[in-house]
A protein has these predicted regions:
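Bacterial N-terminal signal peptides
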Residues: 28-37
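Boundary at the C-terminal end of the N-terminal hydrophobic targeting segment
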Residues: 41-45
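Glycine-rich catalytic cores of cysteine/serine-nucleophile enzymes that process amide/ester linkages
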Residues: 50-129
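Activation targets extended, charge/polar-rich intrinsically disordered C-terminal tails
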Residues: 152-348, 352-362, 366-412
Length: 415
């Protein structure tokens, strides 16, 4: 096999800038070393396969948003010549062109790369993250098939893939590299009953309330359906547990398990100090107080109405854009009935009619949409802060319908 230098250079280039600085010396040495190393050529038979060890590596979560669910890699270790590499399908860079819009639209490309095992462990040790190795009990023929697939994967034209959080990520790629090239079927334990994509990620983002809230807002109806065993393996810990209990060709798939790095105790930061629920209750309380003033005085404040429409419309733009996103489980989202871009279409009309205290059909339209959104919660989980804000907006719509004068009634029109 040929772990070519081009792949390794690409790997170094694609790492975030701080990691590049930390690994710069390591990669220079590695590239020089690999210039004289040749593994087994693609056109020649693979030999000494019995001395090769294939392992699944599972890494514990980190502090960054993209690391909160852990990571998976594959280890290739040739005990005869000492070659020891980690095959990593989770390489990306936030510095690439148009990264943010591409990420929002689900058009982010990830890369597959190879690095020395010592460098891989050094990085995770620096981040205080744990690494567990599961050595696979597979035949020589299985190893040959995996190595052939790896030779194909590592070609420069094959290293890039379109990332999909639930269906095609670093964990599913590592699994497929192994399982899809075994000569016998892997028998996994029974799938988790009633496990949905949303419920599974809640186990990992629960300590980060704003991350959990943001993801719950963006995930739609399809995130709440029951998942299959294969779908449940998008999470590194799930795949590790399944491998541990899997049967292959009459024996355990995993021959032995080793803790290569013990995770360090990390201080978890939940981001913004005020939890989403408290923030929602605070904003809803302000809106309720203003609505009470509206009702008692039978007079609305166009500035507050404008503020609500602009904020909800801006949030609605995000949900509207997600309709066209390639991200899984985001295109069909009932929350768009609560927050959508329609307020911008009615903004000028609302300002004019609120200043004249006239009836505005927008409040009826919005009230109907919000009501339909609450009906949609039967099919989709909606986080409590979003429901609180939606209920607050519904009350605001009702107050307007109660106090606004019909357009035909004007001061001095009666004779």
């Amino acid at each position: 096999m040929n772990f070519n230098r081009l792949s390794l250079r690409s790997h170094a280039f694609l790492l975030p800038l701080p990691q590049i600085m930390k690994r710069k010396v390591l990669y220079i040495v590695l590239i020089c070393l690999l210039s004289v190393l040749q593994m087994i050529a693609v056109a020649r038979p693979i030999s000494n396969t019995d001395s090769i060890q294939i392992s699944l590596l599972t890494c514990s979560p980190g502090q960054e948003v993209w690391a909160q669910y852990g990571h998976t890699a594959v280890r290739y270790w040739n005990k005869t010549n000492g070659e020891d590499f980690a095959i990593n399908y989770g390489i990306f860079s936030p510095n690439q062109s148009y990264f943010i819009p591409r990420f929002i639209l689900g058009l982010t490309d990830y890369h597959m790369g190879v690095e020395p095992m010592s460098s891989f462990l050094a990085q995770y040790n620096y981040e205080g993250r744990g690494v567990v190795e599961q050595v696979l009990d597979i035949s020589i023929e299985d190893k040959e098939a995996i190595l052939r697939a790896l030779e194909e994967n590592i070609k420069p034209e094959n290293t890039v893939y379109r990332y999909n959080f639930f269906y095609d990520n670093c964990t599913t790629r590592a699994r497929d590299l192994i399982v899809n090239h075994l000569h016998h079927k892997v028998i996994y334990p029974k799938a988790q009953e009633d496990a949905t994509f949303r419920s599974m990620i809640h186990k990992w983002n629960h300590s980060f309330p704003w991350t959990e809230f943001g993801e719950d807002l963006l995930l739609g109806v399809n995130a709440d359906r029951k998942t299959t065993k294969s779908e449940q393996q998008f999470l590194p810990e799930n795949l590790k547990n399944d491998f541990e209990k899997a049967i292959y060709n009459g024996h355990w798939l995993v021959k032995s398990t080793h803790v290569l790095l013990v995770p360090k105790q990390m201080t978890q930061t939940s981001g913004f100090p005020i939890p989403p629920l408290i923030m929602a209750l605070f904003l809803a309380s302000i809106n309720l107080i203003i609505d009470i003033i509206y009702y008692r005085k039978h007079q609305a404040c166009w500035i507050w109405d404008t503020t609500l429409l602009v904020l909800s419309g801006a949030l609605g733009l995000i949900f509207f854009i997600m309709i066209f996103s390639q991200h899984p489980c985001v295109s069909l989202n009932t929350i768009i009935l609560f927050f959508n871009p329609l307020p911008f279409l009615f903004l000028y009309k609302t300002i004019q009619k609120s200043r004249r205290q006239e009836y505005n059909s927008w409040w009826l339209i919005w009230g109907i949409l919000i009501t339909l959104g609450f009906i949609g919660t039967i099919f989709q989980y909606v986080p409590s802060p979003a429901r609180i804000m939606a209920l607050s907006l519904l009350i605001h719509c009702i107050i307007h319908l109660l106090i606004d004068k019909p357009t035909s009634i004007r001061p001095g029109s009666n004779k």
